[in-house]
Amino acid sequence: MSFYNHKEIEPKWQGYWAEHHTFKTGTDASKPKFYALDMFPYPSGAGLHVGHPEGYTATDILSRYKRAQGYNVLHPMGWDAFGLPAEQYAMDTGNDPAEFTAENIANFKRQINALGFSYDWDREVNTTDPNYYKWTQWIFTKLYEKGLAYEAEVPVNWVEELGTAIANEEVLPDGTSERGGYPVVRKPMRQWMLKITAYAERLLNDLDELDWPESIKDMQRNWIGKSTGANVTFKVKGTDKEFTVFTTRPDTLFGATFTVLAPEHELVDAITSSEQAEAVANYKHQASLKSDLARTDLAKEKTGVWTGAYAINPVNGKEIPIWIADYVLASYGTGAVMAVPAHDQRDWEFAKQFDLPIVEVLEGGNVAEAAYTEDGLHVNSDFLDGLNKEEAIAKIVAWLEEKGCGQEKVTYRLRDWLFSRQRYWGEPIPIIHWEDGTSTAVPESELPLVLPVTKDIRPSGTGESPLANLTDWLEVTRADGVKGRRETNTMPQWAGSSWYYLRYIDPHNTEKLADEDLLKQWLPVDIYVGGAEHAVLHLLYARFWHKFLYDLGVVPTKEPFQKLFNQGMILGTSYRDHRGALVTTDKVEKRDGSFFHVETGEELEQAPAKMSKSLKNVVNPDDVVEQYGADTLRVYEMFMGPLDASIAWSEEGLEGSRKFLDRVYRLITSKEILAENNGALDKAYNETVKAVTEQIESLKFNTAIAQLMVFVNAANKEDKLYVDYAKGFIQLIAPFAPHLAEELWQTVAETGESISYVAWPTWDESKLVEDEIEIVVQIKGKVRAKLMVAKDLSREELQEIALADEKVKAEIDGKEIVKVISVPNKLVNIVVK
């Protein structure tokens, strides 16, 4: 057989690995550890697509490489299995979301195993397993005990027709719900919050210690949004009331010509004049219909209403009007801002819209034309005139503190984490509310609080989750006869994914989240690979929970993930017509290397786009494995380009990777393999070992594969192959194409054992030294010849060889040599006349 029969070989080795538990996590305490983590998937009904294996293959290559280097490797997989799609499916079909989820997991697992990933399936976790979410609930009870989980009335997007609140992302720009197109209103509801803000400073500072992409760290820094400025107190004219604004530029206070409160601010009704009451009430109602996202859109037209009241500017005593506007959010800062229209574009647009004064306090711009947002020396600012930004801020803060109308303040953009959902398919929150007004956490001995099985998962209609319909589960009585109700909200999908990497370390422990010694052994995660779309929320939440568990003494490290790598996106093949509109792949035919619309005959342009069901360009890995083999898919996805690049899927590229594997198969099975080394491949082999080793370490898998191809080309030029080089090459390709490597290893090594733990090959540095080197010969400054010569020849020897070359002789024939300049290992320059 002169080709790689993947249909026979791949299932054979997958069966062997499963039967022998080949990838069971090593526990030899004398070995170093390596923890390679994938972002575990949500097991959707659609199954895996070819984007999933890109990151999974990367961690698998590293895991196989580290095993061969003598490491204990922890390389697990599990399921982020709670989530809205399963609940929606259950509501639409009447099926149990647990059954639907179990079927999806079985399909995902089948697909993953068909790709030859070296996961330790003994450590599989599932966020919907009560034995798992017992510890999710345990973490929540600890947060509750420490005052970091609390209840609050917060405004939510309420849809009366759906009987539930929906997320900001589910509200359409016209203020209706994405599902059903129903009206959405903002109304306060009791919600569970987690006090992530208590960790803001640590979450920010500890980013500096992480080997993460700088772009991801910047996204987290911006999300946390630390601002140093001042709180300034404004009194309301003619009343005993006052309000506080936070500003990062207290030095511009002399330019504050109006103030703006959020429509929901607690002072609004109290200070609104009778003449303005109707306009204010109408505006408040309109604001309640908009999502926070829509309200803060910089591009939207500025709207607002004057309350009829005035504030007193504390620095100059001037009366300035108090407005309400929906771009100010009650949940952000103090829910009030001072407006300096000369130096803030949004304030400037608002002032122009409503004909409010604009006073320049920083020189350098033309504030009649636009806000001047650069720095400049202060003007029109009394005791701040002539000062720069830093000097003026220090002086005004000292003045505000002395006068008792302000103080220096650090604030964060980060808000506390809204942790409850009015849904069925999630972890029950282990809290009981008693009729005497107290609430208590479910004791650890009674965890897990198991999600009850029910067919009735429709919304309750009261704003509570469907669990409110289940009276038997809901109502409890204490030993002293006091009645209580269980919490009906469930946890968000983020909960189970915030700590799953810890459970992999000790997945069957019934006494604790994980054993302390094992956590010390394995943490932190050495590399975490996943999509950049999780840059903020998941990674920030996981870091928060980890730091909390560190404070409890549960985990030994301050951070969970030492190195993070975001793989790129695999784009689908798609086509555009002359208008730029995308055409579905089933409407395209290929003729003579070009693409045409089946119905119109129009020639189409090929253009990569995100894979989507609507474009019919999603590639199923099952189809690729069937036609080309799992090893081909693995090699192709790693060879497409840099791991972090977004690259279009190509059938031709897939075929090229398959041809390469067939060449590898023929090289090892057809070439005569000898016990003696004739030295012909010394340099090529040692170069390949060195390059592949270094490139795997730096995740440059595409260049590692290119180097493997270089070796195959060199080996094919020789009649015979030295056995140690054949073995070493098979080991080098094993992390990329493990099934092929296992099969070839048996033909060469004849040990009957897996290649997985055979020691990684090493290279001989002395064999990398070049014996020969190319030099150029220049005549009158122009290159006339290139010669291969022995390395490190003297100037005289170089000159002698150059002048003896036939091409050079012809060029200088009949000419007088003025001088010859020789530079060893580089060039010979002959000057003639």
UniProtKB/Swiss-Prot annotation:
> InterPro entries from the entry?
aa-tRNA-synth_I_CS (IPR001412), aa-tRNA-synth_Ia (IPR002300), Leu-tRNA-ligase (IPR002302), Leu_tRNA-synth_edit (IPR025709), M/V/L/I-tRNA-synth_anticd-bd (IPR013155), Methionyl/Leucyl_tRNA_Synth (IPR015413), Rossmann-like_a/b/a_fold (IPR014729), tRNAsynth_Ia_anticodon-bd (IPR009080)
Where does the protein end up? Answer: Cytoplasm
Identify the domain of life: Bacteria
Motif residue range(s): 'HIGH' region: 41-52
Q: Which GO terms describe its molecular function?
A: aminoacyl-tRNA deacylase activity; ATP binding; leucine-tRNA ligase activity
Cellular component, GO, one term: cytosol
GO BP terms, alphabetized? leucyl-tRNA aminoacylation
From the record, which residues define motif 'KMSKS' region? 610-614
- Pfam families linked: Anticodon_1 (PF08264), tRNA-synt_1 (PF00133), tRNA-synt_1_2 (PF13603), tRNA-synt_1g (PF09334)
NCBIfam families given for it? leuS_bact (TIGR00396)
* Record-stated family: Belongs to the class-I aminoacyl-tRNA synthetase family.
The entry's protein name is Leucine--tRNA ligase
Q: Which gene encodes it?
A: leuS
